[in-house]
């Protein structure tokens, strides 16, 4: 029997600077809000209409560190992840729910366009940012003059010898 598919792809603008924190095990978690907009022409009035949807996006691991370092309010970004709904109890005892796009080791993030205006840093890379499929380095953040993190190998046939089944 086939499994279900839970995949979300968004292209939008970051609504505020990322919030990065670290879990007790040392893994990074970064939260952003992402605005996506669609526009259409109203058939009755002929006026151009626009609707903006806000999405909560949570990055985990190395992608969380990269998102926290490079994304800023106004950045345009491509995000690929999955939907996840969390439940917790508020201080009033009521159940609360939130649905988020989770971007983890199976996800992808790509910074689009240039740096947002007013950001005078020179840290924004121009190529896709994806979690490397190798052991983590001792250094948690690359210096701007270093080469970008290696991308996962595109030729998966070369890995056949390492698979035990």
Swiss-Prot record:
CDD domains: SSB_OBF (cd04496). The lineage of its organism: Bacteria, Pseudomonadati, Pseudomonadota, Gammaproteobacteria, Pseudomonadales. One of its GO terms (molecular function) is single-stranded DNA binding. One of its GO terms (biological process) is DNA repair. Residues 5-110 form the SSB domain. Residues 117-129 have a biased composition (Basic and acidic residues). InterPro entries: NA-bd_OB-fold, Primosome_PriB/ssb, ssDNA-bd. Keywords: DNA damage, DNA recombination, DNA repair, DNA replication, DNA-binding. Residues 109-165 are annotated as: Disordered. Residues 130-144 have a biased composition (Low complexity). GO terms for cellular component: nucleoid. NCBIfam families: PRK05733.1, ssb. Homotetramer. Plays an important role in DNA replication, recombination and repair. Binds to ssDNA and to an array of partner proteins to recruit them to their sites of action during DNA metabolism. It comes from the Bacteria. PANTHER family: SINGLE-STRANDED DNA-BINDING PROTEIN. A motif (Important for interaction with partner proteins) lies at residues 160-165. SUPFAM superfamilies: Nucleic acid-binding proteins. Pfam families: SSB. This is Single-stranded DNA-binding protein.
């Amino acid at each position: 029997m086939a499994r279900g598919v839970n995949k979300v792809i968004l292209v939008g603008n970051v609504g505020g600077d990322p919030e990065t924190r670290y879990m007790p095990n040392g893994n990074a978690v970064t939260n952003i809000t992402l605005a996506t907009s669609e526009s259409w022409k109203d058939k009755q009035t002929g006026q151009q209409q626009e609707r903006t949807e806000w999405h909560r996006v949570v990055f985990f691991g190395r992608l969380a560190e990269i998102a926290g370092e490079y994304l800023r309010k106004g950045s345009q970004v491509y995000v690929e992840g999955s939907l996840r709904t969390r439940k917790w109890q508020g201080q009033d005892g009521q159940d609360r729910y939130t649905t988020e796009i989770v971007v983890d080791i199976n996800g992808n993030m790509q910074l689009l366009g240039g740096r947002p205006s007013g950001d005078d840093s020179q840290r924004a890379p121009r190529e896709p940012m994806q979690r490397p499929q190798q052991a983590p380095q001792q250094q948690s953040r690359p210096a701007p003059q270093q080469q970008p993190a290696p991308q996962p190998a595109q030729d998966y046939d070369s890995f056949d010898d390492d698979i035990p089944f």
